[in-house]
Curated annotation (Swiss-Prot):
Membrane topology of the entry: Multi-pass membrane protein
Keywords: Acyltransferase, Endoplasmic reticulum, Glycoprotein, GPI-anchor biosynthesis, Membrane, Transferase, Transmembrane, Transmembrane helix
Gene responsible for this protein: GWT1
GO biological process, one term: protein localization to plasma membrane
Organism name: Debaryomyces hansenii (strain ATCC 36239 / CBS 767 / BCRC 21394 / JCM 1990 / NBRC 0083 / IGC 2968)
Transmembrane region(s): 15-35, 48-68, 70-90, 122-142, 156-176, 201-221, 244-264, 268-288, 309-329, 366-386, 396-416, 439-459, 464-484
EC number: 2.3.-.-
One Pfam family cited in the UniProt record for this chain: GWT1
Positions of glycan attachment: 395
Protein name (record): GPI-anchored wall transfer protein 1
GO MF terms, alphabetically ordered: glucosaminyl-phosphatidylinositol O-acyltransferase activity
């Protein structure tokens, strides 16, 4: 009879995944929750309490991947009805609602400041936090029988909720990291035309390397813990020694290495070249078979970790794609040609009030990016010369799937905020807390997942016990995040 460790490993192995359309429908529950939350907070004179906040922004997502995984449309309806009723009641009781929801005053003409450039946008907070919530729930839920196997990571070829989640986490990191770049570029006291200097280049790489040491240390700690505690592992996911924290830790280092290129070439072009080049290398050489073969696993350190090493190329491409969205998603006003590049203060002053073809608002930019990325993804899907979607490889199809999905999701959040939300009324403490301590919340989720697996036979839990554990887990993460946020404790790894 096999050990419990072997049973758990088998439970997450050789899976085939589900459909792309179902993945969209399930994750769109977060959009329904965001819409309902905004309708309630915008149209009712009601300050949303922590329990209601938790139910709308966490419980609904948990329900979508457990109890309502086979009836997602019903869940959408159950979530939206309270919001729609709130809007009806609010409009009925407030005759001057249109006056109160009049258009925002236009910004005064003149030169904008750095503070006006990087304003807080609730829809980005909701997007990043909901992504983190569903990721944290999934990494624990996958070890229970209640979690549908079609949502778990596939072995090699195919799509699933968790496969999408990994790439989306990296995309979100890229988007968030672009904030510092935009700020630096627009800083009037520092902003000058880029000139390559070896000393600055080396300094940037060293700075990024030092900054990422804590995340790489977490990767090492996870490796040692898994090996010494006999924790279940899925070798074909990243390899014998590699793990997701190592991938996350290496991203800023390689970003620093290609920094000179990014100062001259639009980020989305660089990302496309990387993932297309990687795809060509796989299909035109023996690299694809080298990665997928099982008989060469123990030949060297490289073959032991071949999935982690080569999939890093795809994740790096996703990271840069995420950064490319920052120039029009994070900014509070339009800057010259922000669809393709991050603007310096001199470029902004020189352009003045001119608005070119590639100067867009957040909504316009997201609409263009969504149409382009979706069209490119579906073309690649049908192309005979491109390999099928594989998170294990992080190939071209996978990269474009992740980018097109996140662009579509961001557009959805943006439209909800633009049409429905009153930013001052739709402030979720839970979403703000997760957004402010994102990587730490992800780390806590991993630690609690490990602790749960070490103390409980997850495969032996029935549905009620499983759901109770997952609710408690989500509640603990939310309380910790909100408490840290309340006292201004932010840990940036």
């Amino acid at each position: 009879m096999s050990s419990l460790k072997e049973q758990k490993e088998l439970f997450v192995s050789n899976l085939l995944g589900g459909s792309i359309s179902e993945t969209y429908n399930v994750t769109a529950v977060a959009l329904s929750a965001y819409l309902s939350y905004n309708l309630i907070s915008s149209y009712l004179d009601y300050k949303i309490t922590f329990p209601v906040d938790f139910i709308l922004n966490c419980m609904t997502i948990l329900l979508s991947i457990t109890l309502y995984s086979n009836s997602t449309n019903t869940l959408h309806l159950l979530i939206l009805v309270p919001g729609i009723l709130a809007a009806i009641v609010g409009r009925w009781g407030q005759k001057d609602v249109k006056k109160s929801r009049s258009k925002k005053p236009r910004d005064a003409k003149g030169t904008k400041t750095e503070k006006q450039l990087l304003v807080k946008k609730p829809f980005i907070t909701a997007y990043r936090s909901h992504m983190l919530v569903i990721t944290n729930f999934a990494i624990l839920a996958v070890d229970f029988r209640m979690f549908p196997r079609r949502f778990a990571k596939v072995e090699t070829w195919g799509t699933s909720l968790m496969d999408l989640g990994v790439g989306s986490f990296v995309f979100s990191m890229g988007l968030a990291s672009s904030r510092a770049i935009i700020k630096q570029r627009f800083d009037s006291s520092k902003s000058t035309d880029y000139r390559f200097k070896l000393s600055q280049y080396v300094s940037l790489i060293m700075k990024n390397s030092i900054k990422t040491l804590p995340v790489l240390a977490l990767g090492l700690i996870r490796l040692v813990s898994v090996k010494t505690l006999e924790y279940q592992e899925h070798v074909t996911e990243y390899g014998v020694h590699w793990n997701f924290f190592i991938t996350l830790g290496l991203l800023p280092i390689f970003f620093g290495i290609i920094d000179p290129v990014l100062n001259f070439v639009p980020r989305f072009v660089v990302a496309l070249v990387i993932c297309i080049g990687y795809e060509v290398l796989m299909v035109k050489t023996d690299l694809l078979s080298f990665i997928l073969r099982s008989d060469n696993r123990m030949e060297s350190l490289v073959t032991m970790n071949k999935e982690g090493i080569f999939s890093f190329i795809g994740y790096f491409s996703i990271f840069i794609f995420g950064q490319s969205f920052g120039s029009f998603v994070l900014t509070g006003f339009k800057t010259p040609n922000n669809l393709f590049r991050m603007c310096s203060y001199q470029q902004y002053k020189k352009a003045g009030a001119k608005s070119g073809l590639f100067t867009v608002t957040s909504t316009q930019g997201l609409l263009i990016a969504t149409l382009f990325s979706q069209a490119l993804f579906w073309y690649v899907q049908e192309a005979y010369f491109v390999s099928s979607i594989s998170r294990r490889l992080a190939n071209l199809s996978y990269v474009l799937w992740v980018v097109s999905y996140n662009s579509t999701l961001l557009l959805g959040y943006n439209l909800i905020e633009s049409v429905v939300a009153k930013p001052e009324a739709a402030d979720s403490k839970i979403l703000n807390a997760f957004n402010n301590n994102g990587l730490l919340s992800f780390l806590l989720g991993n630690l609690l997942t490990g602790l749960t697996n070490m103390t409980i036979n997850t495969l032996g839990c029935n549905a009620p016990v499983t759901f109770a554990i997952l609710v408690t887990y989500g509640l603990v993460l939310s309380i910790i995040a909100v408490t840290l946020d309340r006292y201004g404790i932010y840990i940036k790894l």
